[in-house]
Amino acid sequence: MKCAVLFLSVIALVHIFVVEAEEEPDSDALVPQERACIPRGEICTDDCECCGCDNQCYCPPGSSLGIFKCSCAHANKYFCNRKKEKCKKA
């Protein structure tokens, strides 16, 4: 009888730890905006929002007046190093 109680206690403890591990939020899931990026052609506000090293947030003339919107566009090969420095995550 004592063995049955001990066995059931062990099963209950294992179950509790498994449930707690499943309910614990993943640290990566807490900040989805860091992983999210904007594809080429979509509206952006900063270079760091655009996907890839070779994309920049291009604002055409008139965008400061609200006539045009800034969007992710292809950048030259030298832009990649500047973007890496600018968009470093602390």
UniProtKB/Swiss-Prot annotation:
The keyword Disulfide bond applies. One of its GO terms (cellular component) is extracellular region. The presence of a 'disulfide through disulfide knot' structurally defines this protein as a knottin. This is Omega-ctenitoxin-Pn4a. GO terms for molecular function: calcium channel regulator activity; toxin activity. Disulfide bonds join C37-C51, C44-C57, C50-C72, C59-C70, C80-C87. The lineage of its organism: Eukaryota, Metazoa, Ecdysozoa, Arthropoda, Chelicerata. Residues 22-34 form a propeptide. It comes from Phoneutria nigriventer (Brazilian armed spider).
